[in-house]
């Protein structure tokens, strides 16, 4: 791949004019050596390990940002799923552990901490169930703790008992947190990855090292401007522009990850090259799709345009780093993307269309606000639909949905900061209650038999 002098200038402009940033440096921390049958001892061990390993993360990010002139927006921590770490306590609530995570994260100054999680794709242990039932109060009583539940996989199928409980958990969290904000910190996955640096779904997988650095980059504005300034006419040429731009974005993330690894003396794990939008004008995935030729994101052709974008980003990123991992693609969070917000408000971008888009993009239904009266079984049905797409297509899918108590279609909810605001989107009138209440497990598909 040849590099022209104009491309070097473009790289400089990425930061100055196009909202390019390193979205996060995330340290993953293994907590297995913190296990104790005494929950107070466990909490003490967790606090000590997180504050010891993560104490220099924020300062390191500041030094690297100043050295290279690249904004590093967030510093985060992910930990081993707490349902695994807390099982020996036999406690009936893990809220105190969530509060310990919150205190530890605040003590070292990070933005978020993830890993208040349970992996229940094939069944729930007593500890898994305790954790899931602890989520509403944990979200109510903490500020920066994020939670996730993996309810399915291509190899295991979909655990519908866990899907039902997840829907009830989200509904309960919405009822006890202001405007359902606690739900913005809960993700329900199918095929969750163990090295995700992004919140709210990050956790530190059991196959990872004792500590690891994972980096997430962001550059929707860079891609959009590259397309606007290119001479691309055919979609083949559009894909080539996106691929070359993703290469440049990825090289920056690789540099930051390697440097952070040296400074912190922690191994570099992966670089997640997902295009992660923000509510800022010019930092939108939806606007990239419109630049390709759509009048509005959500119209016919949107899924195809998103597939092109997602694939080109991966191809460009793979050439720039041998450590690509995480989710790596394009995020479509409604409340965090100015173009998605506008498309949803116009009525063109619907929940159904977003579901179709998730079949070809990085994750799933993300930061979607729905009426507060939405029943738990409907939320479970939405989760099951999304999980089915992930299970059949052997990809990660997820749901981060916010039922906003007291609000209905036509209103909106303001989350602030990177989480933005979202119009309340309609859900289907029909009921899936009988289907969800059947429970059991949707068997793994035939494509799970790969050996």
Curated annotation (Swiss-Prot):
InterPro entries: UPF0210 (IPR007841). It holds the Pfam family DUF711. Transmembrane segments: none annotated. Disulfide bonds: none annotated. Belongs to the UPF0210 family. Homodimer. This is UPF0210 protein APL_1491.
């Amino acid at each position: 791949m040849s590099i022209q002098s104009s491309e070097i200038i473009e790289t400089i402009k990425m930061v100055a004019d196009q909202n390019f940033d390193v979205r996060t440096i995330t340290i993953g921390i293994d907590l297995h050596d913190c296990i104790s049958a005494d929950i107070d001892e466990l909490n003490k061990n967790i606090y000590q390990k997180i504050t010891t390993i993560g104490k220099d993360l924020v300062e390191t990010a500041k030094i690297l940002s100043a050295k290279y002139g690249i904004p590093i927006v967030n510093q985060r921590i992910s930990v081993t799923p707490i349902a695994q770490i807390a099982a020996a306590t036999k406690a009936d609530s893990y809220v105190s552990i969530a509060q310990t995570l919150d205190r530890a994260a605040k003590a070292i100054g990070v933005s978020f901490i993830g890993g208040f999680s349970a992996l229940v794709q094939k069944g729930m242990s007593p500890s898994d169930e305790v954790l899931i039932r602890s989520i509403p109060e944990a979200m109510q009583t903490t500020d920066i703790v994020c939670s996730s539940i993996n309810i399915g996989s291509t190899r295991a199928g979909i655990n519908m008992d866990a899907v039902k409980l997840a829907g009830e958990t989200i509904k309960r969290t919405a009822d006890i947190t202001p405007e359902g904000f606690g739900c913005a910190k809960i993700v329900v996955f199918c095929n969750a990855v163990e090295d995700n640096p992004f919140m709210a779904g990050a956790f530190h997988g059991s196959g990872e090292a004792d500590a690891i650095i994972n980096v997430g980059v962001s550059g929707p504005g860079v891609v959009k401007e590259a397309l606007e300034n290119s001479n691309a006419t055919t979609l083949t040429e559009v894909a080539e522009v996106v691929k070359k731009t993703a290469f440049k974005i990825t090289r920056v993330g690789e540099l930051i990850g390697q440097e952070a690894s040296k400074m912190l003396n922690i191994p570099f794990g992966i670089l997640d090259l997902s295009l992660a939008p923000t509510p800022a004008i010019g930092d939108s995935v939806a606007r990239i799709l419109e630049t390709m030729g759509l009048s509005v994101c959500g119209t016919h052709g949107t899924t195809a345009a998103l597939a092109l974008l997602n694939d080109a980003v991966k191809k460009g990123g793979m050439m720039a780093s041998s450590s690509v991992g995480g989710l790596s693609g394009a995020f479509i969070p409604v409340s965090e993307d100015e173009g998605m917000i506008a498309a949803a408000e116009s009525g063109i971008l619907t929940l159904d269309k977003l579901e179709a888009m998730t079949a070809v993009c990085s994750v799933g239904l993300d930061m979607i606000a729905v009426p507060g009266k939405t029943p738990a079984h409907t939320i479970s049905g939405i989760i099951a639909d999304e999980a089915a797409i992930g299970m059949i297509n052997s990809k990660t899918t997820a749901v981060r949905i916010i039922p906003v108590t007291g609000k209905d279609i036509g209103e909106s909810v303001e989350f602030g900061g990177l989480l933005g605001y979202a119009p309340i989107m309609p859900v289907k009138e029909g009921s899936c209650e009988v289907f969800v209440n059947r429970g059991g497990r949707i068997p793994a598909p035939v494509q799970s038999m790969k050996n």
